[in-house]
Amino acid sequence: MKPSTEWWRYLAPLAVIAIIALIPVPAGLESHTWLYFAVFTGVIVGLILEPVPGAVVAMVGISIIAILSPWLLFSPEQLAQPGFKFTAKSLSWAVSGFSNSVIWLIFAAFMFGTGYEKTGLGRRIALILVKKMGHRTLFLGYAVMFSELILAPVTPSNSARGAGIIYPIIRNLPPLYQSQPNDSSSRSIGSYIMWMGIVADCVTSAIFLTAMAPNLLLIGLMKSASHATLSWGDWFLGMLPLSILLVLLVPWLAYVLYPPVLKSGDQVPRWAETELQAMGPLCSREKRMLGLMVGALVLWIFGGDYIDAAMVGYSVVALMLLLRIISWDDIVSNKAAWNVFFWLASLITLATGLNNTGFISWFGKLLAGSLSGYSPTIVMVALIVVFYLLRYFFASATAYTSALAPMMIAAALAMPEIPLPVFCLMVGAAIGLGSILTPYATGPSPIYYGSGYLPTVDYWRLGAIFGLIFLVLLVITGLLWMPVVLL
């Protein structure tokens, strides 16, 4: 697209800010709160349209609010307090997101992913599973799922995991059986494998807190609005029954609903064996990497009472540097990690301001009045269903989470009977699982969609079927299991 045709992407966020700012301030809100909300909404529109990278959009929004803080961030009462310096306070607010533990946890997880990539351990694990399980097409589907499952806890970019590690491996498999893209032979085995690639990425993105950046964004938003949080272990245990069910069910379900013509063969295991021989035996760097990852997972699951999850990640990254698994240049040059670091920290800062100015509490009271008289369970399920279905309207999981999660959290806070940890975990799971609905929902989606093995009609049909199954199972386990371990 030519720059001259993109002007509207720049003007739309500004127009939204202006329109909201000109609307009379609603009853119960102060003027600075309403103006803050106007800028916040403009940032969300900017994240959706992306005239510039998302991190830049968020930083511009923070800059506007901080510079105009006497009118957008602070109340007249605050400004009138003796010794109150809005310049220092606004700067402190602007950079507050960078001290959030969630930010450093996801940054550490990105470095773990770099270690997997540099040592070749991630590729080796996937090839071993393909070699051992690739004799039957159904088992090959499980190999794809297990590969994603092993990589997910330490790869917070589902795009890097799905499109960067798994896809480059599995795209080599269909041609071994003369299953070609954009051809009638694609259904031989290629279509099943490619569908398993994207559906496994979506499932594993929901299983672990550190499997997808928006999961951590949600926790940051939750903490800024309520001071409550979910640890890595809370997320893992809360998702455990649903995780086991989906990991075991999905490959078989895909096999039944989108059956491959070819049921078995030896070409894939032989190819994987050749690739493994080319890699050579497990080297010392891979062994060190494996040991550190196992240690990190153990501490994340069982060490919550003794050490913060972010501190675990921070310490493991330091050990990775000392053990020469990664270099300092790897950290400095990791554009993806720094990109997420900046936009996630900036969005958490903006969400904190939304709460500090009183908008969240006002919106919660507004919802409380409209939701009164309904069962908390019915309200919770209805909110999850609405949140899930709105995924159709977003091409970015980050924009989706940034736009809707604060409203979902405010709605839950409006009804004290709704258990916030359970509700937020259901919202978090919906972010990952709902990514299966469309071929544009998350980073790897267009990669698999564009592989030539997944026709448009098939993708939308399977997305709707699997999406519905995921939603039903999420609601059931959310109501029956999550309260047992989270409350």
Swiss-Prot record:
What GO CC terms are in its UniProt record? plasma membrane
Membrane-crossing residue ranges in chain numbering: 10-30, 33-53, 54-74, 93-113, 137-157, 189-209, 236-256, 292-312, 313-333, 340-360, 370-390, 393-413, 418-438, 465-485
Keywords in alphabetical order: Antiport, Cell inner membrane, Cell membrane, Membrane, Transmembrane, Transmembrane helix, Transport
Q: Does the keyword Amino-acid biosynthesis apply?
A: no
**Which reaction(s) does the protein catalyse, per the Swiss-Prot or TrEMBL entry?**
(2R,3R)-tartrate(out) + succinate(in) = (2R,3R)-tartrate(in) + succinate(out)
Compartment(s)? Cell inner membrane
According to the UniProt entry, its GO molecular function terms are: antiporter activity
- Tell me how this protein sits in the membrane: Multi-pass membrane protein
- Keyword Cell membrane listed? The answer is yes
Report any Pfam family annotated for this entry: Na_sulph_symp
What is its biological role? Catalyzes the uptake of tartrate in exchange for intracellular succinate. Essential for anaerobic L-tartrate fermentation.
Q: Which family does it belong to?
A: Belongs to the SLC13A/DASS transporter (TC 2.A.47) family. DIT1 subfamily.
- In its UniProt entry, what is this protein called? L-tartrate/succinate antiporter
Which gene name does the record give? Answer: ttdT
